Amino acid sequence: MGVGIQTMWSILLLFSCIFSAASASVSYDHKAIIINGQKRILISGSIHYPRSTPEMWPDLIQKAKDGGLDVIQTYVFWNGHEPSPGNYYFEERYDLVKFIKLVQQEGLFVNLRIGPYVCAEWNFGGFPVWLKYVPGIAFRTDNEPFKAAMQKFTEKIVSMMKAEKLFQTQGGPIILSQIENEFGPVEWEIGAPGKAYTKWAAQMAVGLDTGVPWIMCKQEDAPDPVIDTCNGFYCENFKPNKDYKPKMWTEVWTGWYTEFGGAVPTRPAEDVAFSVARFIQSGGSFLNYYMYHGGTNFGRTAGGPFMATSYDYDAPLDEYGLPREPKWGHLRDLHKAIKSCESALVSVDPSVTKLGSNQEAHVFKSESDCAAFLANYDAKYSVKVSFGGGQYDLPPWSISILPDCKTEVYNTAKVGSQSSQVQMTPVHSGFPWQSFIEETTSSDETDTTTLDGLYEQINITRDTTDYLWYMTDITIGSDEAFLKNGKSPLLTIFSAGHALNVFINGQLSGTVYGSLENPKLSFSQNVNLRSGINKLALLSISVGLPNVGTHFETWNAGVLGPITLKGLNSGTWDMSGWKWTYKTGLKGEALGLHTVTGSSSVEWVEGPSMAEKQPLTWYKATFNAPPGDAPLALDMGSMGKGQIWINGQSVGRHWPGYIARGSCGDCSYAGTYDDKKCRTHCGEPSQRWYHIPRSWLTPTGNLLVVFEEWGGDPSRISLVERGTALDAKKL
């Protein structure tokens, strides 16, 4: 190619790129989001990048695309990206730019929910814990320290996206951004400061000039030009606060979260499809499945408190990235049917006619197109309806879609996809376990602090660990009557949560724990004390920090008292104001026993002398990765409570000892769904299997470390492959 021609080609290419970026635009009217001048029905799904591994991302995105999605929606997780003030992290599972670019490579759009409050059953709602200790701070209100920190992080994310040219107006995939998150109920509770904060947040976000619309979910008074959107199991009755804004549903709840101690929620595919079709027929044009792939709360990222390590959410793609049938396929077919109506849906508003006492037709008819949705809202009875000269059979609680106003191509209750059954197949058991017992900490050790009275746990640990020791000495005189009459004194402890192990003179006296509904707990038990000095050691254990509510700066955990000892010669002692010695974390954590190098720093016991069913015990074993690429999990059904690591990476908290309470029974797709309906695994562990990402393994010599708080039988831990088997018949 000649120099002149090459120069001309370069100029043309440059102008082409400039024109392409300049012509890219995102706007909206009352019908839809408008991308580059085209009104779109947009189907989205939530995939949270830190809840899977970078190696999983391409397959998850591809399966989302194959499932008929146009958009991937994700939160931005502030505490993962700014673990300490001004120190940012965007690597590995937190490589946000890489994730967005992978979405772009598949030709999908992105809805970036910057927040930076996320809720999401994520630790502290996504806020970094250091934020709680900024002087004068009050969270999510008209408070200058909070607004300054929030604006700084939001600007950081927007600047990164702009630098990588990731907004649609730059030729990138981001078509929408979200500021704040479900703030409406909080604003209603706190009043004027909340309203001022909402106005400030909207103005701040719009001022960042991203070139794409901003949204606020569950925010009825979202200031213009911000679009208010709906979250919920159903959103057909939602209307945006201005007639010129589109009807958007940012969270179609495909299931519900699992909490330790709770049954496992499911939501029938038919009802999810029904809710979506009902939203579309009522004029909705953007919907997002929360979650499309839930993933895993690796490490200590689970919030709640008491959120399980699994964030499966009964999503169309399960925790391991496998399609959940029939939900994935049934929704794929729904999306195809909706897309076949797109031209009519974005052109006109529907006309609604009654077809029966509990049946309706929603018809979108323009000069060139006609699409109809025939709905049966009856939860018990099928009906035959007449429409446009034809007869249509509508099962209970269902909607049929007719892209040409004549031909039914889809009904939400008629499932064409095959159902699948989960299979967990053992591939490795009989690990060569070794044990190391974590001895009870004493007050005279190093790295301890002695203070007058009881102190809040997170204030001391700064959430660097789940564990905080509270220690004091109880001196018993030789003349105490209980030493002779055998009536042991009653020790009573009140804690803000979340779990507590009580040790006296190195021996476990009892364990208590709370729940998501009531994280506070109390211990009250007659205890064995001897004449002289008795060592009382309380191991307070957090199980994730709350992710929703008001006044985050006031939340607490740990032993706040009172602590009393009743049944002494002098009556009852109030020990709350005594001198207490504090130690953050465990010895094993400080030694790094979960790492290859740290695990060699102590003497481990193996064989017949190995500890079993002992509290505060570390276990380690090595194993080779099984062949193949099937997803892997650990079956922890024989263990109590603790944490798991693979090659130094934290799988998360295990707690199979917390048995699911509640009621499980028959599940009908028909009728209004809520999170108490269609629950499973009552009377079983809330979570038995724990996801082990393939990418964390090497072919040989993988280090598996388990810390067990209660005591368990590690010999029964096994590595399993997760797979699915399709039912022979269609539903």
From Swiss-Prot:
Q: Which UniProt key words apply to this protein?
A: Apoplast, Glycoprotein, Glycosidase, Hydrolase, Secreted, Signal
GO CC terms: apoplast
Which top-rank group of organisms is this from? Eukaryota
Family membership noted in the UniProt record: Belongs to the glycosyl hydrolase 35 family.
Listed name of the protein: Beta-galactosidase
Under Enzyme Commission nomenclature, its number is: 3.2.1.23
Q: Which InterPro entries match?
A: BetaGal_gal-bd (IPR048913), Galactose-bd-like_sf (IPR008979), GHD (IPR041392), Gly_Hdrlase_35_cat (IPR031330), Glyco_hydro_35_CS (IPR019801), Glycoside_Hdrlase_35 (IPR001944), Glycoside_hydrolase_SF (IPR017853)
PROSITE patterns membership: GLYCOSYL_HYDROL_F35
Gene Ontology molecular functions: beta-galactosidase activity
**Endpoints of the signal sequence:** 1-23
Which biological process, per GO, is one annotated for this protein? carbohydrate metabolic process
Has keyword Secreted? Answer: yes
